[in-house]
Amino acid sequence: MADKKNLLLLFDHPTEPVFMDKGGNGTVFDVPASYVTDRYNKMCKKVQRRVSGGFEKNVLVKEIPIPDLSCSMRLGRSEQFSLFLESHRQMACHLIDVFIKMPTVDELQSVAVYARDRVNPVLFNYALSVAMLHRSDTKDLGLPAFAQIFPDRFIDSQMLRTMREESFVVERSAARLPVHSSVKYTASDLDVEHRLWYFREDLGVNLHHWHWHLVYPNTAPDRSIVDKDRRGELFYYMHQQIIARYNAERLCNHMARVQPFNNLEEPIAEGYFPKMDSLVASRAFPPRFDNTRLSDVDRPINQLRVGIDDMKRWRERIYEAIHQGYVLDANHKKIVLDDVKGIDILGNIIESSQLTPNKTLYGDLHNKGHILIAFSHDPTNKHLEYAGVMGDASTAMRDPIFYKWHAFIDNLFQEHKRQLSPYTEEDLTFPDVRVQSIQVESQGQVNRLTTFWQESDVDMSRGLDFVPRGHVLARFTHLQHHPFSYTIEVENSSEATRYGYVRIFLAPKLDDGNATMLLEQQRRMMVELDKFVVTMPPGSHTITRDSTESSVTIPFKRTFRNMDNPGEPQNFLCGCGWPQHMLIPKGRAEGLSFELFVMVSNYEDDKVDQKPEDCECSIAASYCGLRDRLYPDRKSMGFPFDRQPRSGSELLEKFLTPNMCSIEVIISHEARTEKIPELPDHS
């Protein structure tokens, strides 16, 4: 029986033939001759002996009849794969189906080995990842970080060249020096938007977006893979939180909040020049020039035709449905957009996913928007150009237009929320529970948080193909903050033990005009920091919580190499989640005022009825849910700020009920870089 961990080796060196050594220790797959492509059939064994020497491990691949893979092979191996293209999603769907239906790990390994050298490498990675996440016999395996397998999605082409040079010239891994990523490679200070480079081009931020769409695919052969609990609502909330965080960073950098891209006929003022090459396509990611205008896309090669008029029509139909309070399914039956399921239904319509009740009527608004922008430089394939970064889930967040587009998408969801009745004081109050005070403490400072720059390494060697083996480190400069802790004083004046759900949010106190922010604006900038359950016996007591325990983030070591434990494996079971180092906004050198909000709601009202089993993936549940389980909160995502405030609550202080509290927190930024000590050169 095959060791299922060997499946992880199939992700390594994605453009090299499958029979080449994998895993960094000379492991090779003993591939049946009928599985080897015609080009290498006669030389396979000779190449294995040459590149692996005395290889340590030989993985036997069982020869089985191979299912029809022709659908998934329609996309060439050197072409660009995009989840935003429906034709590509269907190809991936077919391959996922093949992988899912293999009855044993042995047979899954066999068909995956066969497919690997015949299917587009990124499509293969995506399909095998989704299948392994959803098969009962492989879902406990930790997938390798996407950045380690396809580093070209996360670093510029010059850095890639330098890493290849370091790998080729310096034979011993221990003697190789990290290759530094420049912080100024996509634009100069003349570009105002470049002030946000540390957010848009952050490794962890882009990995989060890719991994979320991996965990929540919008198309799959088995509907249950897509139809996860509150999936559409999660699409709304996760992206809404990205926009809230982005707007906070804009205020930190003396910039106005992002303007939604409402008029598709207006030029896109911001250009973007990614400076990245696709190793699979052997092409540069195309740039987009300032003031580019969108036009209808007609690309038969991509089975793609979408017009601006289509987008307008879908938008108007969605707005009409929101105002009517219902959508129509494919049989013209009404589905009510109520205050519980409405947002979930809209999420699947607007994205749109396989769960949309009527794609013919409501279209494919979000996905096609990405495509219109991604092909704006070559909408008819006249110049044989591939999509820009907006066409790939792992690169889209690098582009300033991503945030304008998603601000527009978020406005659709907010229009639905405006139709709902505001929460009353009774809805918000937790009888007999009072939050008496809150404070945060960091490095001996109270209610003051500090950010700075930090250098961290990622081993990219598994994605560097056709170069000598051994570790090759990429060194990134990223935002970081000192860890902090919350102290919450709570009083339970009843005579019984109560269970509370602590909800912590952060939002700027002042708007871009330096005026106190009205709650209707501020609620959309409320960034969720944490959510957890507490037990409250009668009387007063203190709740403490560390920032590293956040329910929205994944641990730092899951984004970057842990320098204290360099031998720690880089495969991680639960890669979905906001990066811990980006938990709080950057702030300003002189300090910037934020309001920290804490609410303790009644957990008896909020809890979800499901068995209290240990969940393998319980981190980052706020943005990513729980694997194979219901979302762990009955309230609407973003509660209590997902609806308009009640009358008389124009400011946050007037919104508060006794079980809430808010304080001012100052976030300061220190313009220093915490560097990693350079290792001595033993070459």
From Swiss-Prot:
Free-text function comment from the UniProt entry: This is a copper-containing oxidase that functions in the formation of pigments such as melanins and other polyphenolic compounds. Catalyzes the rate-limiting conversions of tyrosine to DOPA, DOPA to DOPA-quinone and possibly 5,6 dihydroxyindole to indole-5'6 quinone.
Record note on cofactor: Binds 2 copper ions per subunit.
Catalyses which reaction(s): 2 L-dopa + O2 = 2 L-dopaquinone + 2 H2O; L-tyrosine + O2 = L-dopaquinone + H2O
Residues bound to Cu cation B: H366, H370, H406
Native organism taxonomy: Eukaryota, Metazoa, Ecdysozoa, Arthropoda, Hexapoda
Protein name: Phenoloxidase 3
PTM field: Upon activation, a trypsin type protease cleaves prophenol oxidase to yield the active enzyme.
Binding of Cu cation A, residues: H209, H213, H239
Cystine residue pairs: C574-C617, C576-C624
Major site of localization recorded for this protein: secreted
Keywords: Cleavage on pair of basic residues, Copper, Disulfide bond, Glycoprotein, Melanin biosynthesis, Metal-binding, Monooxygenase, Oxidoreductase, Secreted, Zymogen
Gene: PPO3
Family: Belongs to the tyrosinase family.
Compartments in which it is found: Secreted
